[in-house]
Design a protein with these regions (language model features):
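Repetitive helical segments and hydrophobic/amphipathic motifs
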Residues: 12-13
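Detector for the c-type heme attachment site
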Residues: 38-45, 97-98
Length: 100
């Protein structure tokens, strides 16, 4: 009986954690979608604005943190990057670096 209760608890815990992971993924996609207005669908630029898709995660994170701190001058990107936490910046870096 104890074994069944333990297995049931593990199953419910797994379901709860998968829901949390899904919520994080939705949040990341939502904030990443704001980038797509200028950087194109999926981060693939259709114009003069640089593409984000396919850049390495570290590069995206570094650029966003430099924009946020003011180390890299840019009026528009500073305003955008300033609204994100470091965790959100990391998540966006991973999102655009991963193949879709």
């Amino acid at each position: 009986m104890y074994k069944k209760a333990t297995l049931a608890f593990a199953g419910f815990a797994g379901l709860a954690l998968s829901g949390i992971a899904g919520a994080v993924d939705v949040h990341t996609r939502t904030i990443a979608s704001t980038c797509m207005t200028c950087h194109g669908p999926g981060g693939r630029s259709l114009g003069a604005v640089p593409s984000l898709a396919g850049l390495e995660q570290d590069r995206i994170v570094t650029l966003l943190k430099e924009f946020k701190s003011g180390a890299r001058p840019a009026s528009i990107m500073k305003r955008h990057a300033s609204g994100y936490t470091d965790a959100e910046i990391e998540a966006m870096g991973a999102y655009f670096a991963s193949p879709k």
